[in-house]
Amino acid sequence: MATTRKLVVEVVDAKDLTPKDGHGTSSPYVVLDYYGQRRRTRTIVRDLNPVWNETLEFSLAKRPSHQLFTDVLELDMYHDKNFGQTRRNNFLGRIRLGSDQFVGQGEEALIYYPLEKKSLFNLVQGEIGLRVYYADEKPPPLKPTVAPLETVVEEKTEETKAEGPDESKPPPETNDIPAEVKETVKPPQPPPEESSPAEGPKPDEEASPPLQENATVGGEEPPASESDKNEAEAKPVEEPPQNQPDGEDIVLESEDTMSWASAPRSPLPEVIISRSVSGSIPETKNGPQPLRRSVSETASYTSEISDVSTIERSTFDLVEKMHYVFIRVVKARSLPTSGSPVTKISLSGTMIQSKPARKTSCFEWDQTFAFLRDSPDLSSSPILEISVWDSSTGIETSQFLGGICFDVSEIPLRDPPDSPLAPQWYRLEGGGAHNSDLMLATWTGTQADESFPDAWKTDTAGNVTARAKVYMSSKLWYLRATVIEAQDLLPPQLTAFKEASFQLKAQLGSQVQKTKSAVTRNGAPSWNEDLLFVAAEPFSDQLVFTLEYRTSKGPVTVGMARVPLSAIERRVDDRLVASRWLGLEDPNDEKRGNRSRVHIRLCFDGGYHVMDEAAHVCSDYRPTARQLWKPAVGIVELGIIGCKNLLPMKTVNGKGSTDAYTVAKYGSKWVRTRTVSDSLDPKWNEQYTWKVYDPCTVLTIGVFDSWGVYEVDGGKEATRQDLRIGKVRIRISTLETGKAYRNTYPLLMLVNGGVKKLGEIELAVRFVRTAPPLDFLHVYTQPLLPLMHHIKPLSLFQEDMLRNTAVKILAAHLSRSEPPLRPEIVRYMLDADTHTFSMRKVRANWLRIVNVVAGMVDVVRWVDDTRFWKNPTSTLLVHALVVMLIWFPDLIVPTLAFYLFVIGAWNYRFRSRAALPHFDPRLSLADAADRDELDEEFDVVPSNRPPEMVRLRYDKLRNVGARVQTILGEVAAQGEKMQALVTWRDPRATGIFVGLCFFVALVLYLVPTKMVAMASGFYYFRHPIFRDRKPSPVLNFFRRLPSLSDRLM
């Protein structure tokens, strides 16, 4: 039975509302509007924290499915003036929710939305709690009292036919409807003819829409919307629904909906199809009728599921067009064989063979082949040969049944959005086929053709795993298990008042976590610990709790409890969910009388972003809960054109070969290009699109060599890992809006011998902003991670552990796809091995710090040169600047800001315009790295190197650690000397400092501050003839202060 989709909004409560009645309270009610339908809750009298707990429903039966993603749910909250008059505005706040934030039933969660202002001068505060989700319900059964209704409809129909329409006579009950409601009343509709079983529709009459549940009988007016003031005056036309909440529901239908519902349906015009066939095949008049359509909606492989027809399709303007000759072999008839024949297609010296035909009423293949062609207009005219062979007698002794030849220059050119070419019947010539026909279609198209993804391509060698594919990462959640306490856990072998140690172990799949050991004497230990896991949808696993009693001989299991993940509540904020008591069952005890129990609080934290990438190259920061997603601010388009000068990655049949493919990852969407077989200069020319929610994210592209199933030196190596060729990262924030970048990037790999260039990849990328300019700039002021990361932050240990778990889950999920995305590819794209130790990275990071501080060092050097009058003109100008800033201190901040503005404006000329930044071997110190350091970087844990080499590396690391230890000691000593100024560790030094502070306080109190500042400035920039070459007394005094270094052992 068909179901009806509806939008359900649960208005739960509100908090901290604005007082409106003049007595410190308000009487709020909520009005919701969705697609012309309006609902209203009841009024909560004099309460700033009202609780409604009402469920309001909106019908989506008349809403086209592709337009559901563009609707907005508007919620307005008002103060009811009937419960406390006020001269001020009774507006309490509003929110607007896009339909992309709505989830299906079962995924909903209570979310508190902050109330927003309607205008700048509104005083709004507080938040409202909602649950919004889609629900499907079965239509109600037909009522048994339909016969009288049909009689009335039939009689009214006869009267209508006899009298005809009378436009001068007003419809009944019009005078009883209020003025504001009359504007939205539908015109009278003719009663549906299909409601009468005795009288069928006539061919010369237009078909009326079916009778709705709320339709009136005998041409009466349909129900109109009613306001609160006119509810008692207006005459009701239909009964309210039975499931209407306590509050008053206002249902308003827009004029567009009414006209759409009342528009008559015109019959489809007869479609006449003419088709040319070859030979003496008779013309088929009873062919399949094509579907009518007004606008071509040909989908391409760049479109997503959520794309709607109103969105412009990708035009493939970032890549080059690659022309293919497509041959679609559908079926054959009247073949003189009883086996499973095959078709062979030959073009330009390339021959391919189809799969064996399926024997039904005809011989069916329904297979499409694509031959690469340089251009649609060739000077020569190659011949396309299609032949049918009977393979039942063996592959080598196949019998020729017939064939067809085509001139490629006469094959039509098709480019979407053109409609697909219909296959035709062709008479087979030659062989043993005399009256055999083959149905096929041939055309010349590009990679934008909808048949291209599933076609057998010549550049992929027909490998099933070589197709282009779009993957979606599984939806990951953080599962928080709060272990509170346990009861009745005293083992029988222990006596009272004897301490016992207990530990709770939680396991989810391969994830195992344990609490700390809790010691108790009464059998009621307490932990209050949070255990975090990563869970992937769909939730089919179970969370297993095992309570262990710690003994000297080892842990002893006291009991176990299982909780299915589907029964765990979801939350999107830090509110406390209801806890539960779980009964523990002893797996070795058959008696289940008295059982111990444990107190647990379980929830899925949807307010976190599950990290699966390194923080500095993350491609998505959205939380798990879809309700918290912000609207997209733009789209990024990536054109993967091809690679050049690739090195052979493997040996196939004694010959070097590379079967390259590209993987791109952004957010939860992965794309994989087709695998170009045995080519060192592969061309893909595939274009993909992603939605951008945060511009400060990174798009990652990796190139790999596929092993597949090949004869490698005489043996099949199907289980070998795909080899890495290189990787490119593109930060979205570095792209200008609307500008297309087409660049060639080197593919670099760091191996044990150093940096190795394995080729180049040519990419085209473009970022298009879809959000308003101010909204787009407002994103830069928002935190990167969701709010829960700041309210209840995770520790570094938890982040690393959960990230490694998330990578394993994603790798296992994507490896089960077809074609699979292998785990080594996923780990390389997610940078799962970036946490390994490397002396090269240590030195590179140190040089990065030096480069950052270099600007400050230059400033200090310039100030020192100014002090010593190396440039007298500059020193005199600095004196004048000091005098001006001291006497006019209001100019200090503007001068600094103007100086930074000048620097930024000056550097604008030197910005990168064409090339995008990519991996820098010099910055990474990869071009000058020591071989021993690289070998140490690629060493596994635990090390598999010889003991002597491990000892040498350990001694080197000890030397580096000693230098780091010295630097840390110096930093700690300087801080301790600062503390010694007032701690009286050195009584004389502290006395001098305290006395000087008292003297400075008196001077600054008696002497104007500007005079003191000017004197200090002139003293600091005094001429060298007034200086002494010894260190300053202040520095000497600070160096003599004591530290705690002499107390270290």
UniProtKB/Swiss-Prot annotation:
Domain of life, per lineage: Eukaryota
Does the keyword section mention Repeat?
A: yes
Gene name, per UniProt, is MCTP16
UniProt-listed InterPro entries: C2_dom, C2_domain_sf, C2B_MCTP_PRT_plant, C2C_MCTP_PRT_plant, C2D_MCTP_PRT_plant, MCTP_C, QUIRKY-like
Q: Which organism is it from?
A: Arabidopsis thaliana
Q: Which residues bind Ca(2+) 1?
A: S338, D390, T393
The membrane topology noted for this protein in its Swiss-Prot or TrEMBL record is: Multi-pass membrane protein
Taxonomy of origin reads: Eukaryota, Viridiplantae, Streptophyta, Embryophyta, Tracheophyta
Looking up Gene3D superfamilies in the UniProt record yields: C2 domain
Q: Which UniProt keywords apply?
A: Calcium, Endoplasmic reticulum, Membrane, Metal-binding, Repeat, Transmembrane, Transmembrane helix
Q: What is the protein name for this chain?
A: Multiple C2 domain and transmembrane region protein 16
